[in-house]
Structures are given as structure tokens and as C-alpha cells.
């Protein structure tokens, strides 16, 4: 018989012992895991039982907080029972406030709308759990139909709540509730209701959400529902104005100008879109486009003083001086308190005089024409000074030059002192 070294027996025995230890450790860990799971489940049941008792005892807010603490643990979010207890807690708070209002007792109306908002959040969260496929990969919805039917009856409270907070100038909460109202249209929970095509209040809710975002200087909130808000034709001008202001604040020039153009196309005589789009074109030296804007606006309202003044500025820049003066006189005939009409007419004459004055040589006839231009400019510039006394930067130098050329010594001395003080 072959002799086997004792070392071999030792190694085999040692290996068996090691395997046994590993097996025991695995069994211990499995037992510990099962115990921990059991303990966790037991603790959950206890908390849910306590929450149900709290709801009955009139402590629904405490029950809600307890269930939300459980759901904060990702491992618990798939537990439908926690969601259901949470909903009962929120629902009870809504019913309590509603009862107080019905009985005309003193209560905080905001709590009613806040509870309604939370009810939607809870059942939408439950629906996401309900929609998960089972172990066979199939989705079996147990709650959707019932919960959607229940919430549909309360959905109007989200809109009303948004309006409530809007009137209270609580624009952040107003946005939150209007946003929840709108987003129901995208929630799988309400798929069968087809709010997108059937709910005629969605555009107005979108406008109010946009306005709320605008009032809180939140560009993301302002622009979130802008496309839907544009379907609210009664408030389209305001929608485009708030959107344009938001793009301008963000420095998005392309979107800003595009929105101005859209607004101007809808209403060429708008007191917002015409001036802003005109300023953009004119300040960049695009006089042709600026003039086109003026003519389009005047084609609808020939006596628009804003468009007439804007056009006179373009004509002055384009050196169409006779047309500029003619238009300024028409403006003054409509309203003799508009200072810029006098300024533009005065500069139209003044510029022509300076052009002759700056020439190396000029004939006697040219000099006479120059003085005539200065005299014509004078009456407009003096009136402009009276109407805009603080705009010394615009009237001081022209009047200084006019007084000098017309030998008006006393007036020249006064203007010289004013210029030196600037």
C-alpha cells in the first residue's frame, strides 16, 4: 500500500474546514438579511398602522410626514400601501379644510389648494409604481382608472388655486399650481381624458403660468409654456411681450427680435412691438427697414404720433430734410407738446445750414440760404429748449451756433456759459 504523507491529510482537512466556514458565513448573512428585511417590513407596518390611527385622530399632517419619510427611502417607493396611506392623509386634510369652508368657519383657504395639489402629486407617484411591469413583464394597472376619475373631479381646483395665489401676488405658488394643472395633460394617469385636445382652458392656464414666471424673474418658468400660451389669442400680445422681455434679459438677440417681429406682424400699431423693433433696427443703422416699419404702422393708423415721430427721425438720418420738416409740422399740428418734433425739424434746417457753413467757399446766395436755414432752425430749437430744458446736450450747441451766425450777442453769451458748464 502506497504511503500518503500526513501533510496531504492536513491540507484536505483544512480545505473541508474552510468550505464549512464559508458555508456558515453565507447562511449567517442570509439569515441576517432575512431578519433585517422582516424587521424593516414589520417597522413599515407599524408606522403605517400608526399613520392610519393618526388620521382618525385628526393628526393627518403628522401621518403625511411619516409616510413621506418612508418614501424618502428608495427601497420603499415601490410599496403601494405606503402611497395609499399617504394619499388618505392628504385627502383628509383637504376634506377638513373644505368642511370648515362649508361651515363658514375661519380657515386658511390656501391650505385647501395646497392639499389638492399634493393629492395630485401622490396619486401620480402611485401611478408610476402601478405602471411597473410584474415578474412576468406585464403591466397590470390596479389603480389608474379609479384614481384618474377621482382626481378629474378636483382638477379644476388646481386652476382655481393658481388664480387664488395670483391674486395674492404669490407668483411662485401660482406658477406651481397652474403648472400642475397643465402637466396633467402629459401624465399617463390621465391619458384617457385627452386634456390636450378637450381642455379649452389649457392656453389660459399657460398664459397665467407664463405671467407668474415673468413676475418672479424666472426665465425658465416664463418660457416653459410659451407655445401653449400663444394659443390664448385674447392675451397673445401680452404673451409675446413677456417672452420678448425675457429673451432680451437673457441676451438672446435672435429670439428677441424674432418675437418682436411676430408681435409687430400681429399688431403693427402696438405701443410695445413697434417702438422696440424700430429702436433695434434704427440703432443699428438699418434705416431702410426702420422706414418700412414706420410706413407699415402708419398704413393702419396714419395719425400714430409714435410712428410719425419715428419716421421723422429716420428721414432726418437719411437727410431727407424737406420731408422731415413737413412731417414734423404735421405732428405739431396734431400735438404741439411733443418736443422731439421740434428737435427733428430744427435739426433738419440746422444740418443744411452747417453743410453750407462748412464748405471752403460759398457764394452770397449760398450764405443767404445758410442764414435762412439758421433762422428757420431757431424757432424750432428755442421751442424744443422750453419743452425739454434738461436736454442741454441736444439744444445747447445748435443754439450756440445759430446765435453766433445770426449775431445774437446776448443769447450767444448765455449759451456760451451753458456750454462751458456742461
Predicted feature locations:
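Short coil/linker segments at helix-helix boundaries
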Residues: 89-168, 183-204, 350-380
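Start-of-domain marker
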Residues: 44-109
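Conserved structural position within tetratricopeptide repeats
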Residues: 71-72, 183, 227-231, 262-265, ...
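Residue-level recognition of tetratricopeptide repeat
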Residues: 77-79, 188, 235-236, 270, ...
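Structural register within alpha-helical repeat arrays
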Residues: 50, 86, 93, 154, ...
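Residue at a conserved register position within TPR or TPR-like alpha-solenoid repeats
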Residues: 54, 90, 165, 213, ...
Amino acid at each position: 500500500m502506497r504511503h500518503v504523507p500526513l501533510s496531504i491529510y492536513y491540507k484536505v482537512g483544512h480545505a473541508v474546514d474552510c468550505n464549512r466556514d464559508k458555508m456558515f458565513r453565507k447562511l449567517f448573512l442570509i439569515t441576517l438579511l432575512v431578519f433585517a428585511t422582516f424587521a424593516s417590513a414589520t417597522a413599515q407596518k407599524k408606522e403605517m398602522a400608526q399613520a392610519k390611527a393618526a388620521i382618525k385622530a385628526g393628526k393627518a399632517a403628522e401621518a403625511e410626514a411619516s409616510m413621506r419619510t418612508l418614501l424618502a427611502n428608495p427601497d420603499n417607493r415601490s410599496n403601494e400601501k405606503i402611497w395609499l396611506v399617504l394619499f388618505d392623509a392628504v385627502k383628509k386634510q383637504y376634506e377638513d379644510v373644505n368642511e370648515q369652508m362649508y361651515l363658514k368657519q375661519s380657515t386658511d383657504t390656501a391650505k385647501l389648494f395646497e392639499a389638492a395639489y399634493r393629492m395630485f402629486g401622490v396619486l401620480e407617484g402611485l401611478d408610476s409604481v402601478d405602471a411597473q411591469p410584474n415578474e412576468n413583464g406585464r403591466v397590470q394597472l390596479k389603480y389608474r382608472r379609479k384614481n384618474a376619475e377621482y382626481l378629474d373631479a378636483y382638477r379644476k381646483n388646481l386652476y382655481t388655486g393658481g388664480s387664488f395665489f395670483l391674486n395674492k401676488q404669490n407668483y411662485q405658488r401660482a406658477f406651481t399650481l397652474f403648472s400642475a394643472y397643465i402637466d396633467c395633460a402629459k401624465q399617463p394617469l390621465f391619458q384617457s381624458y385627452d386634456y390636450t385636445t378637450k381642455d379649452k382652458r389649457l392656453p389660459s392656464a399657460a398664459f397665467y403660468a407664463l405671467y407668474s414666471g415673468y413676475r418672479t424673474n424666472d426665465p425658465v418658468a416664463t418660457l416653459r409654456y410659451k407655445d401653449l400660451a400663444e394659443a390664448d389669442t385674447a392675451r397673445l400680445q401680452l404673451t409675446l411681450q413677456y417672452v420678448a422681455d425675457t429673451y432680451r434679459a437673457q441676451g438672446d438677440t435672435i429670439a428677441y427680435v424674432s418675437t418682436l417681429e411676430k408681435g409687430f406682424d400681429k399688431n403693427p400699431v402696438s405701443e410695445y412691438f413697434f417702438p422696440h423693433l424700430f429702436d433695434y433696427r434704427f440703432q443699428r443703422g438699418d434705416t431702410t427697414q426702420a422706414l418700412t416699419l414706420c410706413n407699415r404702422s402708419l398704413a393702419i393708423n396714419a395719425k400714430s404720433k409714435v410712428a410719425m415721430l419715428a419716421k421723422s427721425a429716420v428721414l432726418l438720418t437719411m437727410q431727407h430734410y424737406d420731408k422731415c420738416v413737413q412731417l414734423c409740422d404735421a405732428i405739431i399740428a396734431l400735438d404741439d407738446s411733443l418736443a422731439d418734433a421740434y428737435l427733428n425739424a430744427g435739426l433738419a434746417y440746422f444740418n443744411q445750414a452747417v453743410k453750407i457753413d462748412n464748405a471752403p467757399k460759398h457764394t452770397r446766395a449760398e450764405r443767404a440760404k445758410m442764414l435762412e436755414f439758421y433762422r428757420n432752425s431757431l424757432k424750432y430749437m428755442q421751442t424744443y429748449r422750453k419743452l425739454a430744458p434738461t436736454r442741454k446736450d441736444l439744444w445747447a450747441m445748435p443754439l450756440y451756433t445759430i446765435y453766433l451766425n445770426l449775431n445774437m450777442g446776448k443769447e450767444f453769451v448765455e449759451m456760451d456759459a451753458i456750454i462751458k458748464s456742461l
